[in-house]
From Swiss-Prot:
The chain crosses the membrane at residues 32-52. Belongs to the FtsQ/DivIB family. FtsQ subfamily. PANTHER family: CELL DIVISION PROTEIN DIVIB (PTHR37820), CELL DIVISION PROTEIN FTSQ (PTHR37820:SF1). This is Cell division protein FtsQ. PROSITE patterns: POTRA. InterPro entries: FtsQ, FtsQ_DivIB, POTRA, POTRA_FtsQ_type. Residues 53-264 are extracellular. It is found in: Cell membrane. It comes from the Bacteria. The gene is ftsQ. Residues 57-126 form the POTRA domain. It is a single-pass type II membrane protein. Essential cell division protein. Residues 1-24 are annotated as: Disordered. It comes from Streptomyces collinus.
Amino acid sequence: MAGPTTAERGDRQQESSGPPPARWSGTRRLRALVVLAALLVLLAGGCAWLLYGSSWLRLERVSVSGTRMLTPADVREAASVPVGAPLVSVDTEAVEARLRRKLPRIDTVDVVRSWPHGIGLKVTERTPVLLVRKAGTFVEVDDDGVRFATVSQAPKGVPVLELTASRSGSGAASFRRFGTDRLVREAVRVGGDLPAAVARQTRTVKVGSYDDISLELGDGRSVAWGSGEDGRAKARALTALMKAVPGARHFDVSVPTAPASSGS
């Protein structure tokens, strides 16, 4: 039986001399992965340099909006935002906490990055709804009962709170049970429930105890409100009573189902 010819042996040698197809394919995939990984590393490094190392994305300006009593300069100083630092490195939560701590007049603040070079501080200030006299000045109280600022002059249209209860006598029980802060919050609660027309005329809110809150209006009339409970019902009763007896000088809605008036 004849063996393979010289040509046939040569063909077989050529076929077996190259790498196996599967091995060649695996090598190409490995090279592609290495190249891809290198590109990703370069891309990540470039992004990191752009954000932290370059001068293109650094903080250059701090804008302030929403101020009323505060000035933009007050807010910028309290914020202490590091101008010149990489914008991405600014800790917006820390800036917000710093502003709220240093400026109690601020109720809320939004700190936002304004690419490529800015930080925006959007401020909402607290609004006083009551004033508490203190050593010739006035402490402003907001609608949450927070005492947030002291001013030398009373803001126009904001009633003064008078805590007429004493720590002894008839008001002592309220002080022991509720404390001053709770009584202040009850006064704020009453102020929030007042009919708009009455709220505009209110000059003084007197708190004798938890259930003895009264109002003095600018025209000399007075209102016995009682506690801060049932505020909406009391507001409706007061509105109706003032319309029914416009000449009265004193109104009592402490029991809203049985309002009363007196004086003329």
